[in-house]
Amino acid sequence: MAKKKFSKDWIHQHINDPYVKLAQQKGYRARAAFKLIEILEVEKLLKKGDVVVDLGSAPGSWSQVVRERLAGPGGVVDGRIIALDLLPMEPIAGVEFFQGDFRDDEVLHELERRVGNHAVDLVISDMAPNLSGVGVADSARIQHVCDLALEFSCAHLKPNGVLIVKAFHGSGFSQIVQSFKQRFKRVVERKPKASRDKSSETFLVARDLKDPVLNQTTE
């Protein structure tokens, strides 16, 4: 009975969520689009010509936002967007999507092959592992996903590149923040208005690598 009530409450909340309604009006595939929009505006990120990697992209709302901001004359993308997710994603014009598990070495190598020698301006990650409800196990899964995004970013970002990653408050969060601060000069925490009040999610915005692998002139 409690589970059924929870389901009804969630449906009621979802239907009456202003961001759900706004996403439908704007044509975004998910309300999460507004989380990224706010972060990009506050941090003054993303310009035409940028190379962006979207990790955990399905259903595609973040890629939609990036595409809008990189669109030039005629709606053609001025830049590059590479998206990856474990789940399938309906095509978005100008977005290079492929399906796979980012935790799989073969998938990671394929992503790196697609990026090639192009230095990345922005990595965005809305990835979240399946949670079991067991605190220690869930914290380890969350940290692992964040670490993977961090390592990829450190290897492929421009020196002044930026990583936006979803994390969750709780056990292990401080360790995630510390690992980001060891690699980036500036790390801030953002809780967009579109994040639900009861959610423990937060977004880390890390910029300016301390020890960049790629040269600024790499294209």
Curated annotation (Swiss-Prot):
Disulfide bonds listed in the record: none
Enzyme class, UniProt record, top EC level: transferase
Sequence positions that bind S-adenosyl-L-methionine: 60, 62, 85, 101, 126
Pfam families per the UniProt record, alphabetical: FtsJ
Family: Belongs to the class I-like SAM-binding methyltransferase superfamily. RNA methyltransferase RlmE family.
Compartments in which it is found: Cytoplasm
Name by which UniProt lists this protein: Ribosomal RNA large subunit methyltransferase E
Name of the gene this protein is made from: rlmE
Keyword flag rRNA processing: yes
Natural source organism: Bordetella avium (strain 197N)
Lineage: Bacteria, Pseudomonadati, Pseudomonadota, Betaproteobacteria, Burkholderiales
